[in-house]
Design a protein with these regions (language model features):
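Catalytic machinery of carbohydrate-active enzymes
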Residues: 1-296
Length: 296
């Protein structure tokens, strides 16, 4: 979406408001003028602690220092709609019925209908097209093309087994079988994690299957690591989409969300296992791993 906007309006300046953990990644996009970190998750976690309200007030004042021609909310959530309202500018977002949360949809000055049957990435692109009055048939461009994977020269498989949503987690027993299969193909396995729960899962799998648990990294550091990875296997998280954008060979495991609407999209080799209603068995994932490894 950001790449599209910059191509259509090369003189525009794009500021991106993003959860603070993702700020290092957004800074890597060449079309972004300024990254504005927000700490909604941390504020929720530490709500009531000393200094939080002052931090929120300072953030709100800072956000209102600039006036924008358009404030475009591509999330369609109540929290993102509130942040849009705090900003100075004409708010544009998904209309009720199109937005992920109905109350968000009624809050924007300009409400745009976009089919909920489209993939989420394409929905965001279409929202920007309608908001800014252009049409594009160009392929998706994540703005990370200069970081194309060196996967073929690597013997590392990276595992994304954690998720903030428990419903998206895959069985530890299944993970162990898949990791042993990958190791039999001569790959070294590395685990990444973002929370203590993620780390606990990694440690359970590692205790049975081995592998290396990487230290906690910023997203920009993880991008560098991913660019030299032969294979990624992961559940439905933002990290899975990051791997797809970097064209790393990817196996995406689904079971509680719809891959037709939120699945990985990229120009590299991708195998999707599972569906919106059922997780794959480990044999399906090992077959996919064999296919991708034989490609290169």
């Amino acid at each position: 979406m950001v790449t599209d906007i910059k191509q259509q309006h090369p003189d525009c300046k794009i500021d991106w408001l993003v959860e603070e953990a993702y700020a290092p990644l957004i800074k890597m996009h060449p079309a972004v003028h300024r990254v504005i970190p927000v700490a909604i998750r941390r504020w929720r976690r530490d709500f009531g602690q000393q200094g939080i309200w002052e931090e929120i007030s300072q953030f709100s004042r800072s956000l209102r220092q600039n006036t924008y021609d358009i404030v475009l909310d591509s999330q369609g959530l109540i929290k993102s709609a509130v942040l849009s309202k705090i900003s100075r500018g004409r708010t544009v977002g998904f209309a009720p019925g199109s937005s992920r949360e109905w109350l968000a949809g009624i809050s924007y000055a300009v409400k745009i209908q976009v089919s909920r049957e489209m993939h989420m990435i394409d929905r965001c692109r279409k929202l920007a097209e309608k908001a800014l009055g252009y049409r594009t048939n160009k392929e998706r461009d994540y703005g990370l093309s200069t970081l194309t994977s060196k996967a073929s020269a690597s013997n590392t498989a990276m595992i994304f087994c954690g998720s903030a949503q428990r419903r998206k987690l895959w069985s530890v027993v299944h993970w162990i079988k898949v990791i042993r299969h990958v190791q039999q193909h001569g790959l070294e396995v590395e685990f990444t994690w973002g929370s203590q729960n993620d780390l606990d899962i990694c440690q359970k799998i590692q205790a049975e299957a081995g592998g290396k648990i990487l230290p906690k990294m910023e997203l920009n550091e993880l991008v560098s690591q991913l660019g030299e990875t032969r294979l990624v296997i992961g559940v439905d998280t933002g990290l899975m989409h990051l791997a797809a954008s970097l064209e790393v060979p990817l196996i995406a495991i689904f079971g509680a969300s719809d891959p037709l609407k939120t699945g990985p999209l990229g120009h590299g080799p991708i195998q999707v296992c599972g569906s919106s209603t059922s997780f794959p068995d480990p044999e399906e994932v090992t077959r996919s791993a064999t296919e991708l490894l034989e490609l290169g």
